[in-house]
């Protein structure tokens, strides 16, 4: 069979934080090849698939991935050789079966995902299709609105800002190319605004600035100033989004932010006040990943106004998403390939979300590589939204540039999601 898997290679490479990660090559009988690299997160949900690290303190402070690489070569490869790469479900289910654990802890989600993605790329190459077309068919023509993380706080930066990500969202653009330009211009202007205030410093893991600010509101005020100074209208042309990452400042049933301890209802009221004051269209992880009842209350209060995204809450896991659907907790899901650990399961989760009117936001991780799979995934699934960081750091920009190429390839068929990719407030 020409599209059968002939060989698989894996190696230890570095991610954008200088930490080891897994890269895999899948070679088919017909000579087609797929190459994939897996990312890793800093702020990770407790229910994510297991990222296998060596634990050898003498190498990379214990963060090496040679065990995962060895698992690809010695356990995965012998079981996948001769399997048709066009049968993604079979490839993935075979690896999950070999692993045998509930969270991919035996082989490692990083080993399984690297092979899963490389297989899909090899299969796409074998039939002469770009990955987005292979995944989504002829209807894959929707370019996502980017949620651009331009001010970093929380676990992504060494500063005193509680909220992890402050994002700009170019909802009013007419094309992805225009959206990217708007974002880049606001980001460049933001540099000047911070410099004028004596706040310009380094950037965080995802390329956003990480200034020491007096409050979370100050970050929002600075973003509004940058949007206006760049010549755009806040809300109408460029909106705002937050990743609160509330699990990171949750302790004993309460939330510690702004230097004080607050109840879940106080945090909900605080987020509601921000939505009233600023053109915020999306809030991610507004509450702790196990604070389900508070999530229901948050959704009742804000779900008709803004997008409420579950990241740590859902961890790209279909069973957790189903619980959220049943409870009416949140209205959107963040999709991170390495949270669940295979392409097939990721696509199943996106399908479950779509069937239940939950939106999907395709996302990078804070520890990234030059792999651009998520750009193709966003277009292939018609997700309408992507999170892939700021407008600097090449591992972030690589995804934006891939989307520019896809838009060019699609030509007149390309449609930019803009406000249709987002929640109720942006459509009102």
Swiss-Prot record:
InterPro entries: Enolase, Enolase-like_C_sf, Enolase-like_N, Enolase_C, Enolase_CS, Enolase_N. (2R)-2-phosphoglycerate binds at residues 164, 336, 365-366, 387. The keyword Cytoplasm applies. It is found in: Cytoplasm; Secreted; Cell surface. Its cofactor is Mg(2+). CDD domains: enolase (cd03313). The active site is at 206 (proton donor), 336 (proton acceptor). The keyword Nuclease does not apply. Mg(2+) binds at residues 243, 284, 311. GO terms for molecular function: magnesium ion binding; phosphopyruvate hydratase activity. GO terms for cellular component: cell surface; extracellular region; phosphopyruvate hydratase complex. It catalyses: (2R)-2-phosphoglycerate = phosphoenolpyruvate + H2O. Pathway: Carbohydrate degradation; glycolysis; pyruvate from D-glyceraldehyde 3-phosphate: step 4/5. Its EC number is 4.2.1.11. Keywords: Cytoplasm, Glycolysis, Lyase, Magnesium, Metal-binding, Secreted. GO terms for biological process: glycolytic process. Binds a second Mg(2+) ion via substrate during catalysis. Belongs to the enolase family. Catalyzes the reversible conversion of 2-phosphoglycerate (2-PG) into phosphoenolpyruvate (PEP). It is essential for the degradation of carbohydrates via glycolysis. PANTHER family: ENOLASE. This is Enolase. The gene is eno.
